[in-house]
Amino acid sequence: MSSQVRVAVTQAEPVWLDLDATVKKTCDLIVEAAANGAQLVAFPECWIPGYPAWIWTRPVDMRLSSTYIQNSLKIDSPQMASIQKCAAENKIVVVLGFSENLHNSLYISQAIIGSDGKILTTRKKIKPTHMERTIFGDSFGDCLQSVVDTSAGRVGALSCWEHIQPLLKYHTYAQREQIHVAAWPPLFPHNEDGSLFSMSSEGTSSIARTYAIESQSFVLHTTTVIGQSGVDRMATHGGALMSTPGGGCSAIFGPDGRQLSQPIPSTEEGIIYADLDLDQIYHSKAFVDVCGHYSRPDLLWLGVEGSVKRHVRENAATVAAEAEQQEQ
């Protein structure tokens, strides 16, 4: 495989709370990215059907919550199949952020779809952030395996403030990704109204740079744009976050933290491209490898519980006793 990889990072606005229309727009963006030579295209957090921005204005909105459930994406669905088909037809890796509907419970999810259209992995955000917990559930243990081999290199993904979870980050670093997709909702410049700098466009850019430096990977920082249509659709006027048009700040960072892309204005939609040389990772690895030569696992190590705890499961002792009785 060549060390040269062309990537595309979207900065776009979904068709808010409309599953089918946003799936169509997803495919349009995939086609556009592939036509411009990209081998991988990245989409933001909850790109389908759009991030539920109203949660930062009011914690309960039964009408919108019901609509959101009905328009969230099921993995085994015609809509997902159409995205897979589009990826295969255009021979491009797709890293998709979406609200996953699993038996009408929702999860902040990501899928990595290979250039042959096969889903290589799906994962759920391990813990929804703050008000997101009014909509979304926690992940399962198998979601820790978030890095896979693709035709564009070894690719991994996390969502939003998962990028400030030290243990989760280290576990992801240990899976040896070359390209990392950092998926975010709309992000806005910091102001002095008491909001957290770490939730601003500047703060999250710093988080992306840090991730690149710590992991020695290329980071594709992808964000959503919210226009007036989104503000009106979700009635976020006067809310704490996402109450005005904007939010776009997509970027691409190299494995030493330098920015490799030029920004698109925050209210504008577009795709950012960069030609990556994966061999540049060696330059950073020569100095630091936090899961290799620059580590001390004899002193500090990470424990992981990666099994899936089902909602309904048999007690092991009971199963063994029943089996013994049947043998008698």
UniProtKB/Swiss-Prot annotation:
PROSITE patterns noted in UniProt: CN_HYDROLASE, NITRIL_CHT_1, NITRIL_CHT_2
Domain CN hydrolase residues, every copy: 5-278
Keyword Hydrolase: yes
Top-level division of the source organism's lineage: Eukaryota
Molecular-function annotations in GO: arylacetonitrilase activity; hydro-lyase activity
Record's catalysed reaction(s): a nitrile + 2 H2O = a carboxylate + NH4(+); 4-chlorophenylacetonitrile + 2 H2O = 4-chlorophenylacetate + NH4(+)
Gene3D superfamilies: Carbon-nitrogen hydrolase
E.C. code: 3.5.5.1, 3.5.5.5
Keywords noted in UniProt: Hydrolase
UniProt-listed InterPro entries: C-N_Hydrolase, C-N_Hydrolase_sf, Nitrilase/CN_hydratase_CS, Nitrilases_CHs
Active site: E45 (proton acceptor), K125, C160 (nucleophile)
Ranges in coiled-coil conformation: none
Listed CDD domains: nitrilases_CHs
Extent of the signal sequence: none
Keyword Cell cycle: no
Similarity section: Belongs to the carbon-nitrogen hydrolase superfamily. Nitrilase family.
Reported function: Nitrilase that hydrolyzes preferentially phenylacetonitrile and (R,S)-mandelonitrile. Also acts on dinitriles like phenylenediacetonitriles (PDAs) 1,2-PDA, 1,3-PDA, and 1,4-PDA, and cyanophenyl acetonitriles (CPAs) 2-CPA and 4-CPA.
Name the record gives this protein: Arylacetonitrilase
Taxonomy of the source species: Eukaryota, Fungi, Dikarya, Ascomycota, Pezizomycotina
